[in-house]
């Protein structure tokens, strides 16, 4: 939000793979960096993905406008104005992105805006199909036209997102207060910690599922440096010195 740049938030490993290639195209088209937000759950997962044909590497060349990459005060003021103007184009890209989908539903009492991986938690709770309209967002800036469409069709909105409630804050500012907007700020979802299918289930108004007790618990352990990391030897030496002194 502060960088005025393009941002993606994949909902699956396949989508993350596809977004990387599209991010390079977007970056070259608009001459800006593209960020990808990967949540902890996504980073600690793996899956088989379908890969595309390899592309030939671009020929290296000197940038046409080198000053735009040097953000000294004189350049940054001009660049900031340009980014504000280009942000309208970025929003149009998000409106038509295949990664942002509006899925209609018969029950208009609530519309659900699910960001990135949170979309999976919604669908996991509705294996037969969600009865509420769902707006899946995985490419930013916020597709405001899609949000306004949902707000005009539904009597309330539930924002399901990981981390800070940035989208919830933006939607509250965008809509004002014509309809209730629920999420982490309003208490329907926990303010801190990762989302899970179970706490999302509560926000959807569904009864809590009975779960079986775990057969055994994994004992907690402090974080460790990865095997093969060169820093392990340094810390081993430091611990040896500390024991001696």
For the regions a language model picked out, list residue spans one by one:
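Conserved PLP-enzyme active-site core in the AAT-like
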Residues: 1
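Short, intrinsically disordered, charge-balanced linker/junction segments flanking boundaries
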Residues: 242-245
């Amino acid at each position: 939000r502060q960088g005025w740049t393009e941002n993606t938030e994949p909902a699956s490993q396949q989508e993350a793979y596809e977004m990387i290639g599209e991010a390079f195209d977007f970056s070259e088209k608009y001459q800006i960096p593209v960020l990808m937000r990967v949540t902890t759950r996504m980073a600690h997962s793996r899956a088989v993905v379908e890969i595309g044909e390899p592309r030939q590497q671009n020929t290296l060349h000197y940038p046409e406008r080198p000053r735009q990459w040097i953000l000294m005060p004189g350049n940054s003021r001009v660049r900031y104005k340009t980014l504000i103007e280009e942000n309208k184009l970025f929003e149009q890209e998000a409106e038509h992105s295949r990664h942002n989908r509006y899925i209609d539903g018969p029950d208009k009492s609530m519309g659900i805006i699910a960001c990135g991986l949170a979309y999976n938690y919604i669908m996991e709770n509705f294996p037969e199909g969600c009865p509420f309209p769902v707006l899946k967002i995985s490419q930013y800036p916020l597709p405001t036209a899609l949000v306004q469409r949902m707000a005009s069709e539904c009597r309330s909105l539930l924002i399901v997102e990981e981390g800070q409630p940035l989208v919830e804050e933006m939607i509250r500012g965008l809509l004002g207060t014509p309809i209730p907007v629920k999420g982490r700020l309003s208490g329907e979802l926990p303010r801190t910690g990762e989302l899970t299918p179970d706490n999302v289930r509560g926000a959807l108004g569904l009864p809590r599922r009975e779960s079986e007790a775990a057969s055994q618990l994994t004992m907690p352990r402090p974080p460790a440096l990865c095997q093969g990391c060169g820093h392990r030897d340094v810390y081993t030496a430091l611990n040896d010195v500390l024991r001696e002194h």
